[in-house]
Amino acid sequence: MKPASHAHRTEPAGTVIRRVEWASELDRVRRLFRGYRDWLAGHASPPTGSGPAVLPALARLDRVIADLPGVYGPPGGDVLLAVRGPDVVACGALRAWEPRVGEIKRIYVRADHRGPVFGPKLVRALLARAEELGYDRVRVDALPSMEAAIQYYQEMGFRPIPAYWAHPVPGARFFEWSAAERAPVRRGRGGAPPRRSGA
């Protein structure tokens, strides 16, 4: 897989996937993460089946938002933004999980741009960024109701694995992507802090 540019990569239809500029875009990332939180809160109600189990995750996410960039900043993390014209329409985040293992989090697309486009684009870019940071493997979890996301994770080479953290939602799915199963690519000087809690 060809690594993403350190600045940005241009996707079809005028969309640019680029790294966040923390010094000037912290509030923008907070707004996007709050949008993700609101979306996740919708899974606390029927018919998703997640129920109140989502509520602890919402409380943890509130703390994550307050502490940004936190684990999503250097040296082991990053946030990518999808930009179409003047608008930032989606985001995705990467953080360290274990040494040489990263984790994708916070894939969020604004409601007015949802469809089969931005999620896969962001995941591809995050995998390339993970390799730049030196990660050999990348993990991700998904709620059981996230059928489209689960499908494109598997299409991109993620394989199902046992739970790697105590997810509060029954039936949550866990996946891992391995760079060893792809053609060799340029790797950065990555490293990772000790293992973290899942949320």
Describe each PLM feature range.
Residues 136-199:
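C-terminal "cap" of GNAT-fold acetyltransferases
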Residues 20-105, 110-111, 123-125, 129, ...:
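Acetyl-CoA-dependent GNAT
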Residues 116, 120, 124:
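Residues forming the Rossmann-fold NAD(P)(H) cofactor-binding site
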Residues 100, 116, 132-136:
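Short coil/turn segments at alpha/beta junctions that flank glycine-rich nucleotide-binding fingerprints
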Residues 14-16:
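Extreme N-terminal starter segment of soluble prokaryotic enzymes
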Residues 110-116, 144-145:
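Active-site acidic-Proline motif in GNAT/NAT acetyltransferases
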